[in-house]
Amino acid sequence: MKIFIFLLLFIPNLGLSASMNHIGEKGEPSEVDRVIKIEMFDNYFEPNEINIKKDETIKFLVHNYGSLVHEFNIGTKKMHLKHQPEMMEMIENEILLGDKIDYEKMKEIAKTDHSMAHSHSNSVLLEPNKSGEIIWKFNTEI
């Protein structure tokens, strides 16, 4: 199975479901095998290729050097495509405003639509010059 790790402006991302088991699960800080720094820019991210071994737990340290909100997440192509409408809804509801996130609107909408909270363990949504991290245990080699 091919696995994708995407940097995104606003689309696509992933829809969380049981299918997350296809690529792994949230990792434990005490089990991190390796740390990978991810630098996000407006049209690309570095490094542009990552090799991961089966059962490896990776801590991704992610920083947004771009001028827009960007998202880094781990998922299959199908998962990313499934999440596109949610990301568009965030734009339409003025939660994502180009270079910032309206966290108050995000919290309000998340009361009725939990996917809008963007608190998934395989994803970080970052404003410009902000950082985040993901710890992920992969169950397949990529």
Identify the role of each PLM range.
Residues 76-82:
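Short edge-strand/loop segments of extracellular domains
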